[in-house]
Amino acid sequence: MSTYRKTYKNQSKRFNNGNNSNSTSTELTNLVEMFPDWEADELQGLLSENDNSLEIVIDLIVNNKVSKWEPIKKEKHKKKEHKDDTTDSVTGNANGASNSGSSNSTTASGDRRLNNKAKASTSSRPPKRQQHPNAAHKKNEKTERSKASTVSTTTTSATSSVTKESVPPSNSWAAALSNDKPKKQETKSEASESIPSSNDGGDAETVPEVEQAETLEESHQEPENVEEPIESVSEQSQPENTKPVLKSAAIPEPKQGSWASAIAPKTKPKPKTVSKPVPQPEESKPEEHIPVQEEAQPVESVLEDKPAVEAVQPVQPPVEDEPVEAPAASSVAAVADASFSEPTASSIIDQQPQVVLPTTQQQVDSVGISFGSLSVDAGEPKEAAEVIQDETISEQVQPEQQQQSQQQPLQEQQRYGLYNQQPTQQRYQQNNYQQQGQYSKQQQQQLQQQNTSQPTQQQTTIRLLWSISTTTISSTNSSTRCSIWWLSWILL
């Protein structure tokens, strides 16, 4: 086909005028010198389309309005080539019919038609010549890319298989050492495979070139294909870099299935570190509870002291307890008559245990402290009630002192009378018993003094607070005074 087209092109050139041939030859030479990348056939086609004007062709090429046949624009150029072929065939048939119909015309008209045919052939057929070398280039490129893709897929699959083989850990240290050697051999074989694959890609690119422009086009295409083997080499370098990491991870960490894991002593210190922070909160808890127990001890001692005081009271004879209860009942009746708001307070006093004051403590009737009243007019009866309460406390203390003074001489007389009658052994036992009794009495007296000192202190503090509250709240309502009064009696 190419030989036929060349001969036909030469025949068409013969029909052209001498001036046209000279002009096209000079313009072609100029364009070839200016654009060595372009082929002469392509430049001639552009000249014929643009009426042999250099300026228009140069503008088209410089502004990239016209481009060469390149492998980047594959599909578009193929479609255009098919369209050009169909248009050329249609125009050729039309020209043949017109030539057969106009055979009887003049020679001048025949020459004009031949010139038109030559122009149409020059404008339409140069792209046909471009089809075959470009198609060959495209086929070669497709084969190259398919080969490169297959090589890259094989290399990636090989690397993935190698990594998969290296990932599963071995059950013993001997298996880990044995697996290292075939890995090195596999990497060497992969590197040897990648090198010939890149060489094959280079050989596929070396296609017999017919023209100088084709060599330049292939030189632009080669770096694109060279990038693919570079990527495959980089992919091979990655597993090589990761393999020493796998070695270090496989050797010092034997799994449970190996005998080395059973002998390894590294598992012992781990539970110690876990168990240390656990007892710390347990130790802190008893430390927090210890002061609570210490605080509870004095409360228990006070509770134990109170029944001891109560135990002393039954020692007294029942006959002498009656005058003690009589003034208490009379005092309660007097307090009930004095004011209407105090029966609840008197009931609280009756419920509380009797306070036994020590003999050495002086009686205090009044210290110049006066309590406030619930109302402005009811000040005198409250003062009278307070004096009665003080008198009842003093009356309770006096018979108790008399009872103790009467009991002491009776006990001494009994001891001295029995001392002469009993034998020596009984005397020794009585002496021990007397010493123990005296010691117990001394302890009881000390406890009584401690217990009695506490309520007296509370009473004095409450009276002081009451006097302060009455002075500060002289202008307030009666409800606030009542609340303060109730609190003071509850504290008693």
UniProtKB/Swiss-Prot annotation:
Keywords: Chromosome, Cytoplasm, DNA damage, DNA repair, DNA-binding, Nucleus, Telomere, Ubl conjugation, Ubl conjugation pathway. It comes from the Eukaryota. InterPro entries: CUE. Residues 1-25, 73-309 are annotated as: Disordered. The keyword DNA-binding applies. Residues 23-66 form the CUE domain. GO terms for molecular function: DNA binding; ubiquitin binding. Residues 1-12, 126-140 have a biased composition (Basic residues). GO terms for biological process: DNA repair. GO terms for cellular component: chromosome, telomeric region; cytoplasm; nucleus. Recruits the ubiquitination machinery to RNA polymerase II for polyubiquitination, removal and degradation, when the transcription-coupled repair (TCR) factor RAD26 fails to efficiently displace stalled RNA polymerase II. Also involved in telomere length regulation. Binds DNA. Belongs to the DEF1 family. This is RNA polymerase II degradation factor 1. It comes from Candida albicans (strain WO-1) (Yeast). The gene is DEF1.
